[in-house]
Amino acid sequence: MTPRGTAEPQVRPGIAEDLTGLTNLYNHYVLRTPITFDTVPLTPEGRMQWFLSHPKDGPHRLMVAAEPAPSGPERLLGYATSSPLRPKAAYATSAEVSVYCAPDAAGRGVGTALYTALFDALAGEDLHRAYAGVTQPNDASHRLHTRFDFRPIGTYGQVGRKFGRYWDVRWYEKELGGGGADGGAGRLHQTGRM
């Protein structure tokens, strides 16, 4: 049992029935925080393409943390995704990852559980690197990402304007196990020569 007396959250792939809850959770961040640079609330219909771009297998996943309810539907506590970093083909072995937790789930290990499940699911995929963009300041996200062996690699200064001010985004990088078919580029990076 968690400190709040509820059952441990269950982490699983997202399903279509989650879409309304996922959209509501995301809209909290759209309306109240600079964590996402979306500025207009989304609808479940408007998020359908996003949902469909995260199947249950492959390199682009959606993992959901849910809390079982004694009666009625489970309650969504958060979600994590891996998405294409960029649309060009050479970026295919890189993914951008994100995690969003319900505001009242802070401190319950939901983000850790989501990233654990996401990276376990991605372990067999042809992915070489994961990247995360984190609006600054965000100490909790920094701690989460460093716990998962991400390292800060740079900051886009004042890259987004929301709520009447500019925000920096720090980028984090994590090495993954896949992406081995590099045509020798890995050797060049490691030794400085081919």
Swiss-Prot record:
Pfam families: Acetyltransf_1 (PF00583)
Start and end residues of each N-acetyltransferase domain: 9-173
GO terms assigned for molecular function: acyltransferase activity, transferring groups other than amino-acyl groups
Keyword Acyltransferase recorded: yes
Entry annotated with the keyword Transferase: yes
Assigned EC number: 2.3.1.-
InterPro entries in alphabetical order: Acyl_CoA_acyltransferase, GNAT_dom
Keyword set, alphabetical order: Acyltransferase, Transferase
SUPFAM superfamilies: Acyl-CoA N-acyltransferases (Nat)
Similarity-based family: Belongs to the acetyltransferase family. PAT/BAR subfamily.
UniProt-recorded name of the protein: N-acetyltransferase
Source organism per UniProt: Streptomyces griseus
